[in-house]
C-alpha cells in the first residue's frame, strides 16, 4: 500500500534511514553491554555503568526519532537484525571510552552520509531534521568522550587502577547522577 502523505522523499533516503535506525540501535546495544559490564561485582564502577546506560538510552531515542520521522514522511520502516557487540568484556574504563569514541565517530560519519544523500536528493526536510536533532549532538558527544579519555590518561590510566576509581567517583559521579 502506498502512502498518501509521501512527498519529495526519495527511496534511497528512506532506505538510508532504515540503515541509520539499525546503527543507532546497535550503538544502544553496545552501550548496554558496557553498562552491565561495569555493573558487575568484579568490576564495580557504578558511575561508568550509569554513564553507559544513559548513552544506551540516548542512542535508542535517536533510533526512535528516526522511526517516527520515517512514518511522518510516509516512508516505511524495515527493521533489520541488530548485530551483537564485537566484545563482551572491556579491559578497563579507558578502553571502553576509546571504543565509545570510535562508535560515535562511525555513527557521525553515517549521519553525515545520510545528510549528503538528502542534499543530493533535494530533501530540505530531512536535512533540517538531521541538523536539528543529530549533527550538533554527535559533535558534543565526541568532545565529551575525548575529554574523558584525556583526563583518564592524565590520571595514569590504564596502569593506575586508582585513576579509574577516582574518575568514576568524581568525574562521572558528578556528571551523571
Swiss-Prot record:
<dbReference type="InterPro" id="IPR009040">
    <property type="entry name" value="Ferritin-like_diiron"/>
</dbReference>
<dbReference type="InterPro" id="IPR009078">
    <property type="entry name" value="Ferritin-like_SF"/>
</dbReference>
<comment type="subunit">
    <text>Oligomer of 24 subunits. There are two types of subunits: L (light) chain and H (heavy) chain. The functional molecule is roughly spherical and contains a central cavity into which the insoluble mineral iron core is deposited.</text>
</comment>
<feature type="binding site">
    <location>
        <position position="59"/>
    </location>
    <ligand>
        <name>Fe cation 2</name>
    </ligand>
</feature>
<dbReference type="GO" id="GO:0005737">
    <property type="term" value="C:cytoplasm"/>
</dbReference>
<keyword id="KW-0408">Iron</keyword>
<keyword id="KW-0479">Metal-binding</keyword>
<feature type="domain" description="Ferritin-like diiron">
    <location>
        <begin position="7"/>
        <end position="156"/>
    </location>
</feature>
<dbReference type="InterPro" id="IPR001519">
    <property type="entry name" value="Ferritin"/>
</dbReference>
<protein>
    <recommendedName>
        <fullName>Ferritin heavy chain, oocyte isoform</fullName>
        <ecNumber>1.16.3.1</ecNumber>
    </recommendedName>
</protein>
<dbReference type="GO" id="GO:0006879">
    <property type="term" value="P:intracellular iron ion homeostasis"/>
</dbReference>
<dbReference type="GO" id="GO:0004322">
    <property type="term" value="F:ferroxidase activity"/>
</dbReference>
<dbReference type="GO" id="GO:0006826">
    <property type="term" value="P:iron ion transport"/>
</dbReference>
<feature type="binding site">
    <location>
        <position position="138"/>
    </location>
    <ligand>
        <name>Fe cation 2</name>
    </ligand>
</feature>
<keyword id="KW-0963">Cytoplasm</keyword>
<keyword id="KW-0409">Iron storage</keyword>
<dbReference type="GO" id="GO:0008199">
    <property type="term" value="F:ferric iron binding"/>
</dbReference>
<dbReference type="InterPro" id="IPR012347">
    <property type="entry name" value="Ferritin-like"/>
</dbReference>
<feature type="binding site">
    <location>
        <position position="104"/>
    </location>
    <ligand>
        <name>Fe cation 2</name>
    </ligand>
</feature>
<comment type="similarity">
    <text>Belongs to the ferritin family.</text>
</comment>
<comment type="function">
    <text>Stores iron in a soluble, non-toxic, readily available form. Important for iron homeostasis. Has ferroxidase activity. Iron is taken up in the ferrous form and deposited as ferric hydroxides after oxidation.</text>
</comment>
<dbReference type="InterPro" id="IPR014034">
    <property type="entry name" value="Ferritin_CS"/>
</dbReference>
<keyword id="KW-0560">Oxidoreductase</keyword>
<feature type="binding site">
    <location>
        <position position="24"/>
    </location>
    <ligand>
        <name>Fe cation 1</name>
    </ligand>
</feature>
<feature type="binding site">
    <location>
        <position position="62"/>
    </location>
    <ligand>
        <name>Fe cation 1</name>
    </ligand>
</feature>
<dbReference type="GO" id="GO:0008198">
    <property type="term" value="F:ferrous iron binding"/>
</dbReference>
<dbReference type="InterPro" id="IPR008331">
    <property type="entry name" value="Ferritin_DPS_dom"/>
</dbReference>
<feature type="binding site">
    <location>
        <position position="59"/>
    </location>
    <ligand>
        <name>Fe cation 1</name>
    </ligand>
</feature>
<dbReference type="Pfam" id="PF00210">
    <property type="entry name" value="Ferritin"/>
</dbReference>
